[in-house]
From Swiss-Prot:
HAMAP family (UniProt xref): ATP_synth_alpha_bact
GO molecular function, one term: ADP binding
Membrane topology designation: Peripheral membrane protein
Function: Produces ATP from ADP in the presence of a proton gradient across the membrane. The alpha chain is a regulatory subunit.
Enzyme Commission number(s): 7.1.2.2
Protein name: ATP synthase subunit alpha
Organism of this sequence: Rickettsia prowazekii (strain Madrid E)
Pfam (any one): ATP-synt_ab_N
Length: 512
């Protein structure tokens, strides 16, 4: 059979058209050394900083160092599977993480993979873990409150939507407890239909013990708070690269809510361990060490993360992302490198002191040096009305109390001030995992500031407060409802509250 030259040409053209040359092109390098979770790769001349590469075993790596003849990558996963001489290929993509409402109620790792045994997460939306923080024009000032349910914080150190408020203190002073209480306190808003009141929560555990995180997850499940919470986990046993990535991944999950007109709260527990993980990576990558052996860009490490928390303008949907970073200090030293860095980045700090904790003042908030740089802009009017003088009264009490230690002969006015201060301290005490609705907080603080507790023995103040709130919930719910809806104490509400308190205190004192 003789083929026509035209037919031969057609057959060849068809065959050539079917060959996809581009799909065959891959940029491949080789591992020249590997150890301690770091791989040095030769042959990836065009690779970008922050790009994901794939090793022969399927393990992913993140490019962090670009040198003249090689690149340095941190291995995200089991680095024992990576061997010298293995091929490494470029993905031409930066690190992305799964985002969306499908993640709510789930526990995921630093790369967004589920680790709770509840099956796959169904979401089609991905985001880069490193995103640029919103600019000045895209933001608006913080003006709406985030109710933590903790009297000492909501009254004296208010947190607003879009704020960055640092929780700082020694180990075992109740830092995580404040964060968990804040998550639990959002349950009431989620039980209502108004979307603008709901705050979705993300808890990021960096370098924590698995047992500790399991307890927190169980507590959130028992309180019914996991329905609106995402837990991101990079425990102490995981690679430093995953501990380094975890907060950025979680922040991208929070930005999904922020950029879609919703409100989110993210807790970084804790950034001290995050800085240690980054120091470990930097030293292994042979980057020059600075103060306390941290690399030179450790400030930028946290500033680029915390700047992503923002209250967006109306044009951008009016959503918000609030950040509560946690820092652990050593023996109360807040002048160390990482604490001072994060204090300068955030919009205020809540100082927790072990001395107060051991005295039984819990939450152990030092009201004198704790501050919210947003201030009363993040409080409802009713709270401003009752709590305006509390900080000053507590400061005067501390001064008088320290002065009274030098002598017992005090004039009646000073004695009265000290007694009043002691009762204020008592009324601000609160049990763990018992967040208090804002309207009940307002009643409690009103009772304290208006000196209704003067006739109640100090050891009975807590008992009195519980009895009073139980009574007002049962028989005078209209007062609480009025405060909640009006968001301020009108003359009418105040008259009703005064009448109730006078009758209740009279009856209570008879029982004593």
């Amino acid at each position: 059979m003789k083929l026509n030259p035209i037919e031969v040409a057609e057959i060849l053209q068809k065959e050539i058209a079917n060959i996809n040359f581009l799909s065959e092109l891959e940029e491949v390098g080789q591992v020249i050394s590997v150890g301690d979770g770091i791989a040095k790769i030769y042959g990836l001349a065009n690779v970008k900083s922050g790009e994901v590469v794939e090793f022969k075993s399927g393990v992913k790596g993140l490019i962090l160092n670009l040198e003249n003849d090689s690149v340095g990558a941190v291995i995200m996963g089991d680095y024992s599977k990576v061997k010298q001489g293995d091929n490494v290929k470029r993905t031409k993509d930066v690190l992305k993480v799964l985002v969306g409402k499908a993640l709510l109620g789930r526990t995921v790792d630093a790369l967004g993979n589920p680790i709770d045994g509840k099956g796959d997460i169904v979401s089609k939306e991905y985001r880069h873990i490193e995103m640029k923080a919103p600019g000045i024009i895209e933001r608006m000032s913080v003006s709406e409150p985030v109710q933590t349910g903790i009297k000492a914080i909501d009254s004296l150190i208010p947190i607003g939507r879009g704020q960055r408020e640092l929780i700082i203190g020694d180990r075992q002073t109740g830092k995580t407890a404040i964060a968990v209480d804040t998550i639990i306190n959002q349950k009431q808003a989620h039980s209502l239909t108004n979307e603008s009141d709901k705050i979705y929560c993300i808890y990021v555990a960096i370098g924590q013990k698995r047992s500790s995180v399991a307890q927190i997850v169980k507590k959130l499940e028992d309180a019914g708070a996991m329905d609106y919470t995402i837990v991101v986990l990079a425990t102490a046993s995981e690679a430093a690269s995953l501990q380094f990535i975890a907060p950025y991944s979680a922040c991208s999950m929070g930005e999904y809510f922020r950029d879609n007109g919703m409100h989110a709260l993210i807790i970084y527990d804790d950034l001290s361990k995050h800085a240690v993980a980054y120091r470990q990576i930097s030293l292994l990558l042979r980057r020059p060490p600075g103060r306390e052996a941290y690399p030179g860009d450790v400030f930028y490490l946290h500033s680029r993360l915390l700047e992503r928390a923002a209250k967006m303008s109306k044009e951008k949907g009016g959503g918000s992302l609030t950040a509560l970073p946690i820092i652990e200090t050593q023996a109360g030293d807040v002048s160390a490198y990482i604490p001072t860095n994060v204090i300068s980045i955030t919009d205020g700090q809540i100082f927790l002191e072990s001395d107060l904790f051991y005295k039984g003042i819990r939450p152990a908030v030092n009201v004198g040096i704790s501050v919210s740089r947003v201030g009363s802009a993040a409080q409802i009017k009713a709270m401003k009305q009752v709590a305006g003088s509390v900080k000053l009264e507590l400061a005067q009490f501390r001064e008088r109390e320290s002065f009274s230690q030098f002598g017992s002969d005090l004039d009646p006015a000073t004695k009265a001030q000290i007694e009043h201060g002691k009762r204020l301290v008592e009324i601000l005490k609160q049990d763990q995992y018992h967040p208090c609705p804002v309207e009940e907080q307002i009643v409690s603080i009103y009772v304290g500031t208006k000196k209704y507790l003067n006739d109640i023995p100090i050891q009975k103040v807590k008992e009195f407060e519980e009895a009073m709130l139980a009574e007002i919930r049962l028989n005078k719910k209209d007062i609480l409802e009025s405060i909640k809806t009006e968001q301020c104490i009108t003359e009418e509400i105040e008259q009703k509250l005064k009448a109730f308190l006078e009758n209740f205190i009279q009856a209570y004192c008879v029982m004593l």
